[in-house]
């Protein structure tokens, strides 16, 4: 089947025009007018995922994080450029779905809400009329540490960072969440009355500002977005069965998380 058939179905669910302004999105390498037999879904494109794609004879990669985010001045061989050159050598097309999958109803942030049992969720920060990034909703009243422990368990993490002073452990029930690096949206969480904000990559001074505003936070890191790979595989597999597509769909098993904790 042609790659375009699969991507057209995906974009009907998750349109590119939902993406935030300036985002890198859509086809980034190769062609959609090619026959594909195997598709791989990954969070990132790094040397490990490219090697995995080559080994599995993948024709199309769907990734959340674009391998090319800033304009390139050359494609001269180097450790970073070789990731791209290997994709070109093996004729592997690359399609990027970044903030549109964060924003779309039934997408990544809603998958997070399902896992954490966040109910009555609406968008956190409006990006265009009727749509927004992040989610805010409610959970049964519980202690902050209980929620943090659930986040660790659900996402199979060794640790999370708790943003609080003096080991405070208040009861909380209104939760904001944004996958990836969502510190810039913390004021939306404050304005909408969240008790706690779950997001990754929170800066030191941003954490202090949150606490001054009365907002606690749980930082599970950026890599919880790896949920994208399995959930999108499930969705594509369903479309494959409905439409009789002759294509194999796999999710990457290579870890691209650069962090570990001693």
Curated annotation (Swiss-Prot):
Keywords of the record: Metal-binding
Give a Gene Ontology cellular component term annotated to this protein: cytoplasm
Query: InterPro entries per the record?
Result: DUF34/NIF3, DUF34/NIF3_sf
Binding of a divalent metal cation 2 occurs at 65, 222, 225
| One Pfam assignment | DUF34_NIF3
Q: Where does a divalent metal cation 1 bind?
A: 102, 225
Query: What GO terms are given for molecular function?
Result: metal ion binding
What is the protein's quaternary organization?
A: Homohexamer.
UniProt family annotation: Belongs to the GTP cyclohydrolase I type 2/NIF3 family.
PANTHER family from the xrefs?
Answer: GTP CYCLOHYDROLASE 1 TYPE 2 HOMOLOG (PTHR13799:SF14), NGG1 INTERACTING FACTOR 3 (PTHR13799)
Name of this protein: GTP cyclohydrolase 1 type 2 homolog
């Amino acid at each position: 089947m042609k790659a375009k058939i699969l991507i057209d179905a995906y974009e009907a669910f998750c349109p590119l025009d939902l993406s935030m302004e300036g985002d890198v999105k859509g086809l980034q390498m190769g062609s959609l007018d090619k026959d594909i037999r195997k598709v791989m879904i990954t969070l990132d494109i790094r040397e490990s995922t490219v090697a995995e794609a080559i080994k599995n004879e993948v024709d199309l990669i769907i990734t959340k994080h674009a391998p090319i985010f800033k304009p390139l001045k050359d494609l001269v061989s180097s450790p970073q450029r070789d990731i791209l050159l290997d994709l070109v050598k093996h004729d592997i097309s690359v399609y990027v779905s970044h903030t549109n999958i964060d924003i779309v109803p039934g997408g990544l942030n809603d998958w997070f809400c399902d896992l954490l049992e966040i109910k009555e969720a609406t968008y956190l920060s409006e990006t265009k009329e009727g749509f927004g990034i992040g989610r805010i909703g409610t959970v049964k009243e519980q202690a902050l540490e209980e929620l943090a422990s659930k986040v660790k368990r659900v996402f199979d993490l060794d640790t999370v960072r708790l943003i609080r002073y003096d080991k405070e452990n208040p009861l909380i029930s209104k939760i904001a969440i944004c996958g990836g690096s969502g510190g810039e949206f913390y004021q939306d969480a404050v304005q909408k009355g969240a008790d706690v904000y779950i997001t990754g990559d929170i800066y030191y001074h941003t954490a202090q500002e949150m606490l001054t505003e009365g907002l606690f936070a749980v930082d599970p890191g950026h890599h919880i977005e790896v949920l994208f790979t399995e959930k999108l595989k499930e969705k594509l597999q369903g479309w494959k069965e409905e439409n009789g597509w002759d294509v194999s769909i796999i999710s990457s098993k290579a870890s691209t998380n650069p962090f570990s904790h001693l």
